[in-house]
Amino acid sequence: MEFRFNMHPLFRARIVRINNSLLPTGFVAQSRRVALDATAQISEIINTIGSMSAQAQGLSVPVTTAQKLRNSDHHIYLMFESNDRNGLVVGILKVGRKSLYVFDPSGETVNVTAPCVLDFYVHESRQRGGLGRELFEHMLREENIQPDELAIDRPSEKLLGFLQKHYGLSKKIPQMNNFVVYEGFFASKAQNSTDIDGRRMHITASPNTNLFGPTFTTTEERRRSTSQTRTNVAPMPIIAQPPVGRYAAKRPTCSMAQVNHYSSMVGKISFPEENTGNGKRSVFEEQELDQRLADEMERCVELGAGGDEPDASRYTPHHGLEVKFADQPETLPYDDMPEPGPDPDPYDFHPHHLELHDDTEGGGSHRDQSLSPQSVSQQASPVHPAGSDYGVLGSRKPARYTKQNTGLKNISFGVGAAVMPSGKMEFDQEENEGFGSVKINRPIGKSGTRGSLHDDNESVHSNGSQQGGGGHFDLKFYHNKLW
């Protein structure tokens, strides 16, 4: 495969070996910039050849990339073919050591670290020309290994045929993974049998095998577990260290014992010990003790429920803590309380209640006299007959119907008569009395018409005035012209 850059400076030999430094062995860079350029070029070559190898084997993900090589201790062998231009890369072989769990010929699981062939590819235009065998032989010489010592990772049919044709490897040992090993894989390691025996795995016969899978133990571990010559090692003394931090904080005591209100009282009940001669109570003594305990429990319950009359002095409040207000009425005992009298008649306010009579002149109308709102409100309040039978407490003032009792919270009783013009009283205001003067009056210039309401006064009518005579006016409409 040809690339866009000149590869002759990178390949000083026909086959070069590349490690995780991404530089060919024996490559000497003149400067740091040259080394970085060489690394970038080798990375491009490895990525391109790895993609072509994965495509030829039918793999979805390339096995060989520059990033994977940088993060591992594997090696890549690249075969180069020079020409008059930039040169050609015709083959790649990736090898490395891996720790594998494989089955030996007897069926036992062995953990070995063996050299593996991870990727092998020769360009289609150079196949069946001996280039693959040349590359493979060079790798065997560099790694100093034999073909039967190799574990092949996911070999294709072409690779299996290549190994059988050139090295006579045909007898495979079935494995539980994707690696293929041959019979010579374990025979070549017979001289180092102690290392293999030490790492030979055995499946333990445990009842948890069906649940959690088989458990593997090595021969050395089994030998140590079954050995009788082991000396019992004294266990290390346990040193209790005091807790520190939040673990040393005091815990709150449990309050479950206080749930039962009588647990403290019952716990204090004690009975004299009446033992027989042999140190044990008789049946009659046990029954008597149970009866006494039940009686004591019943007495405690009666005390808690208020069955016995407690001492009145215990519940008498201290006189120094009693507080009595000045306007607080004097309370009478329940037996000395008089019967409540009949309820007072409901008071209805009407404008004609405000008619004032002159005692000196014989009852003439006070049209010329001034009437203040205070006097109107005083006359509008109902007067109840005095007597001790009114109400429960004699010293209580007579009840009045307030705005809260009648539901008319926005209605003023004493102002209704002053606002509403009638034949009994009139207010004429012809001149402006200045800022801050508040008077309730009809519009200026309408003093001649009596008993009629102007349109300007309609906005101050409350809902109660729509029911007929004696309506009230709401004084909260400050935007009205009257204010």
From Swiss-Prot:
Q: Which spans does this entry mark as compositional bias, Low complexity?
A: 370-383
In terms of SUPFAM superfamilies, this protein maps to: Acyl-CoA N-acyltransferases (Nat)
- GO CC aspect terms: microtubule
Q: Name the EC number(s).
A: 2.3.1.108
Q: State any GO BP term from the record.
A: regulation of microtubule cytoskeleton organization
Checking CDD domains in the record gives: NAT_SF (cd04301)
Which PROSITE patterns would you find in this protein's record? Answer: GNAT_ATAT (PS51730)
* Regions of compositional bias (Basic and acidic residues) in chain numbering: 347-369
Q: Which UniProt keywords apply?
A: Acyltransferase, Transferase
The kind of enzyme this is, by top-level EC class, is transferase
Fetch the Pfam families from UniProt.
Answer: Acetyltransf_16
**Stretches for region Disordered:** 204-231, 330-395, 437-472
- InterPro entries given in the database record: Acyl_CoA_acyltransferase (IPR016181), Atat (IPR038746), GNAT_ATAT (IPR007965)
Q: Which residues form the N-acetyltransferase domain?
A: 1-186
Q: Which residues bind acetyl-CoA?
A: 120-133, 156-165
Its biological purpose: Specifically acetylates 'Lys-40' in alpha-tubulin on the lumenal side of microtubules. Promotes microtubule destabilization and accelerates microtubule dynamics; this activity may be independent of acetylation activity. Acetylates alpha-tubulin with a slow enzymatic rate, due to a catalytic site that is not optimized for acetyl transfer. Enters the microtubule through each end and diffuses quickly throughout the lumen of microtubules.
In the record, the note on similarity to other proteins reads:
Belongs to the acetyltransferase ATAT1 family.
Q: What is this protein called?
A: Alpha-tubulin N-acetyltransferase
Source organism of this protein record: Anopheles gambiae (African malaria mosquito)
